[in-house]
Regions:
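A short alpha-helical cap/connector motif
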Residues: 1-109, 113-145
């Protein structure tokens, strides 16, 4: 594994990316990839988005974020593209981000609608665009009664 060394000790990242956080696990995984491509479903305030962008800026990666709400102002970067859309509208999203279809993604992060059937649909739709040795991370799934 060829891992790039990144300094996690700069504020505010130090608190956000402690050794055991899901953000640290994802960034450590992404550092094993050359110019990682990240597909993020769910932005809200942009916490994970900004961590992904920070990493992409360090290593020449790319972040594609989709949210049903307009979250376009949570960040600004040449390494980030945002699309306001339902994350199940795969054809529309791919028409706006054709690079996903052409090149694939290293990491899919699902943090949009947390209902288990929605998460299942997302995985079924987007799995084929995941690169070999890529990963899917899911934040908070509602359990059934």
């Amino acid at each position: 594994m060829n891992m790039i060394n990144i300094n996690y000790n700069n504020e505010p990242r130090k608190k956000l990316i402690d050794k055991n956080s899901h953000l640290r696990i994802m960034t450590d995984f992404l550092l094993t990839k050359e110019k990682p491509v990240i597909l993020e479903f769910g932005v809200e305030r942009g916490l994970s988005t900004n961590i992904f962008i920070w990493l992409a800026e360090q290593v020449g990666g790319k972040v594609y974020s989709i949210d049903i709400d307009d979250c376009s102002k949570v960040a600004t970067s040449e390494h980030w593209q945002f699309l306001q859309s339902d994350d199940l509208k795969i054809e529309y999203i791919l028409s706006k981000f054709p690079e996903i279809k052409e090149l694939g993604v290293d990491l899919i992060y699902i943090d949009s609608y947390h209902e288990n059937f929605h998460v299942q649909k997302l995985i079924m739709l987007w799995f084929k665009y995941l690169k070999k040795e890529g990963a899917i991370f899911i934040d908070d799934i509602d359990s059934e009664p």
